[in-house]
Swiss-Prot record:
Pfam families: Exonuc_VII_L, tRNA_anti_2. The keyword Ion transport does not apply. The lineage of its organism: Bacteria, Bacillati, Bacillota, Bacilli, Lactobacillales. It is found in: Cytoplasm. It comes from the Bacteria. This is Exodeoxyribonuclease 7 large subunit. Keywords: Cytoplasm, Exonuclease, Hydrolase, Nuclease.
């Protein structure tokens, strides 16, 4: 009679066979990721091909070391072991190592991190900083023994001697390289003495260049307040540092040229051009003012300054005539008024009233004559003052008494306000004029 086994007994037997079978202790599988959903710790999903599906498990410690993110539909190669789960009688693969099929894990990680940081906006042009034209200090984050620093020093010294180069000696590949690169970028920003920062290294494999693809390096470059030039690998190599840096150079020499956009020879040539332009401008300005001066010295007003007040004299004569006419009119009107009063007095027959009115009339006449005399004297004095004021405008009389008329830009200067040192002034004198330059200005408080 056959012996019947319990389900658990059979399951334990099968588990023992799985665990002791040398072919199942370490299995190599290739398949497509299915039913994947990112979990906080351990990852559970399926691997499938056209004919079968198998459950797989990745413990959290292993998953964190993969170096890339699993995605639904991704084809991967895995190394693991078979495990049977007794309560359900199902088996699965416990993955110990995995990598994308056909393309390296670093390449996948590169694309995934590039996509992530790109979506955050780290590579946008609006964040790129311009390079200064005349840097005084250039920082270099690279290996102290490589050709990169030698090429940069040689190129900068040739293009613009005197620019100081500050080296931040850094490990550029291997464990801890990315952290050191990021730390030195932040250190350079904390000191705030650099105008430009170059980060770079020579060529190599993607593994050799990986320190410049790690997220900590990329974020340190993005956060840098100092403009960063990336010069990593050869011209055909591309790193995430190239995308986030403000400028990218194919070689260390090209990076040094970007950092010193204006050479010493360029600057000397520019200064010579400016000097020539200034000389031409000064010469043209002198010719212009010399021509204006010649025209002024030949003008009628300059040769016959009395014409300056001819119009004022004519106006003074007109005012004098108008004043005399007004006085005559006023006197005539008052005489007429007196006559009217006399007629009225004669019409009033009483002698006392006539006498009173005659006395009043005489008094008014005396007052009128007195007022007329005062008015006349005032008008004559006013005419005399106007005449004297007009004579004071005669520049020939002013300079004849030993004074000089000061002009700036053909305008008469009445105060030291507005006059500065090195201003050019013109002094008009009795027998000529002087062109002078102000050496010192001493103002008096009024």
């Amino acid at each position: 009679m056959p012996e019947y086994l319990s389900v658990s007994t059979l399951t334990k037997y099968l588990k023992m066979k799985f665990e002791r079978d040398p072919y199942l202790e370490r299995v190599y599988l290739t398949g497509q990721v299915s039913n994947f959903r990112r979990r906080p710790n351990h990852q559970y999903f399926s691997l499938k091909d056209e004919k079968a599906v198998i459950q797989v498990t990745i413990w959290s410690g292993v998953y964190q070391k993969l170096g890339f993110e699993l995605e639904e539909g991704m084809k991967i190669n895995v190394i693991g072991r078979v495990q049977l789960y007794e309560p359900s009688g199902s088996y699965s693969i416990i993955i110990e190592k995995a990598e994308p099929d056909g393309i390296g894990a670093l390449a996948i990680q590169f694309e995934q991190l590039k996509k992530k940081l790109g979506e955050e906006g780290l590579f946008q042009d609006k964040f790129k900083q311009a390079l200064p034209q005349f840097p005084k200090k250039i920082g270099v984050v690279t290996s102290p023994s490589g050709a990169v620093i030698r090429d940069i020093i040689t190129t900068v010294s040739r293009r613009f001697p005197g620019v100081e180069i500050v080296l931040y000696p850094t490990k550029v590949q291997g464990d801890g390289a990315a952290a050191q690169v990021a730390d030195h970028i932040r250190l350079a920003n904390e000191r705030s003495v650099l105008d430009v920062l170059i980060i770079g290294r020579g060529g190599g494999s993607i593994e050799d260049l990986w320190a410049f693809n790690e997220e900590k390096t990329v974020r340190a470059i993005f956060e840098s307040r100092i403009p960063v030039i990336s010069s990593v690998g050869h011209e055909t190599d591309t790193t995430l540092a190239d995308f986030v840096a403000d400028h990218r150079a194919a070689t260390p020499t090209a990076a040094a040229e970007l950092a010193t956009p204006v050479t010493k020879l360029d600057l000397l040539g520019h200064l010579q051009q400016q000097e020539n332009r200034m000389s031409r401008a000064i010469s043209n300005r002198l010719s212009y003012y010399r021509e204006r001066l010649n025209k002024l010295t030949q003008s009628v007003i300059f040769r016959q300054p009395e014409r300056l007040y001819d119009g004022h004299l004519q106006k003074l004569d007109q005012l004098n005539l108008r004043l005399k006419q007004k006085i005559r009119e006023y006197y005539s009107e008052e005489q007429q008024r007196v006559k009217i009063l006399q007629h009225r007095l004669e019409a009033l027959n009483p002698l006392s009233r006539v006498q009173h009115l005659q006395e009043q009339t005489a008094q008014l006449e005396r007052l009128l004559r007195s007022n007329m005399a005062v008015i006349y004297d005032n008008k004559v004095a006013q005419v005399r003052r106007l005449s004297e004021a007009l004579l004071m405008l005669d520049t020939s009389r002013i300079v004849a008494r030993g004074y000089a008329i000061v002009q700036k830009n053909q305008k008469v200067i009445e105060s030291s306000a507005g006059i500065e040192e090195k201003d050019e002034l013109t002094l008009l004198m009795r027998d000529g004029q002087l062109e002078v330059e102000v050496k010192h200005v001493q103002r008096k408080e009024i």
